[in-house]
Design a protein with these regions (language model features):
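N-terminal cap/leader regions of alpha/beta-hydrolase-fold enzymes
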Residues: 1-265
């Protein structure tokens, strides 16, 4: 059994401009809104498979194409240029500490736009890998009621300080901390235990600040783990999912849907 994948069938492409950026956004579904930010190398078939899963579970999904070529498989040498561009692009600030990333302002605007067009109390935002932390930074805007951080990998973990960094500025984190206390803003974070790109120290930083409003799912990827995950397991909600009950990544995907329903409906 392989990871669930899909193509662009049924997705409506529309450019969306905000905060000086314009990206194509792929939309599909009916119900409460979810911004699904793709992982590297972009809107690959695994991300589209996750998008269809959310649509099938009653959500309107908007996927901004921030990098890469939509529909391109997440493998091969074609990955390298996309990764390289992402690491040096100013809007992502991949190595910066205590940084408000310009792309998060765009994502907040997209969340507001989606909220204006969908039912529900607000919208959810899912970030993955390179974009994992952007999902929580987007929650500075009160249109966002639920953030899902799947294997958040920015800033890239090149030092102890980078591993501890929450992936946003102190100003942003203070706003989110206040929203958690006053508005019951909640976040769900996921990682594999052996994944050095999504360090556990980052989760501990956020847990210390947000307390019970920061739910953590850590999937065992140590040698001999019962899920059969390899030592480089990384993509919790896409590449490592096998659609059978009890498979840990599939159960994590189910929890994401449950979490979004709890927060948005």
């Amino acid at each position: 059994m392989s990871a669930p994948e899909a193509d662009l069938s049924g997705w409506v492409r529309d450019p969306f401009t905000a905060e000086g950026f314009t990206y194509d956004v792929y939309r599909k579904g009916q119900g409460p809104g979810v911004v699904l930010i793709p992982e590297m190398p972009g809107v690959h078939p695994g991300v589209l498979g996750l998008g269809n899963y959310l649509v099938d579970n009653g959500f309107t999904v908007a996927i901004p194409s921030l990098f890469g070529t939509p529909g391109t498989p997440a493998r091969g040498v074609r990955l390298i240029p996309t990764l390289a561009r992402g690491c040096v692009a100013k809007e992502f600030a991949a190595f910066a500490l205590n940084k408000e990333r310009p792309i998060t302002r765009y994502l907040r605007a997209l969340a507001r736009d989606l909220k204006s067009k969908t039912p529900g109390k607000g919208v959810g935002v899912i970030g993955q890998c390179f974009t994992g932390g952007f999902a929580l930074a987007a929650a500075v805007d009160d249109s966002v009621l639920a953030s899902v951080l799947s294997q958040p990998s920015v800033p890239i973990a090149i030092s102890p300080a980078h591993r501890r960094d929450p992936g946003m500025s102190e100003r942003e984190l203070a706003v989110i901390e206040k929203r958690a206390a006053q508005d019951n803003l909640c976040a769900l974070a996921l990682r594999f235990t052996g994944d050095p790109m999504a360090p556990g120290e980052r989760f501990r930083t956020l847990k210390d600040r947000l307390g019970d409003n920061f739910e953590v799912i850590e999937i065992d990827s140590s040698p001999g783990n019962t899920g059969g995950f390899g030592r480089i397991a990384h993509s919790v909600l896409t590449l490592e999912v096998r659609e059978r009950d009890g498979q840990p990544a599939y159960e994590a995907r189910k929890r994401v849907v449950e979490f979004l329903r709890q927060r948005l409906t």
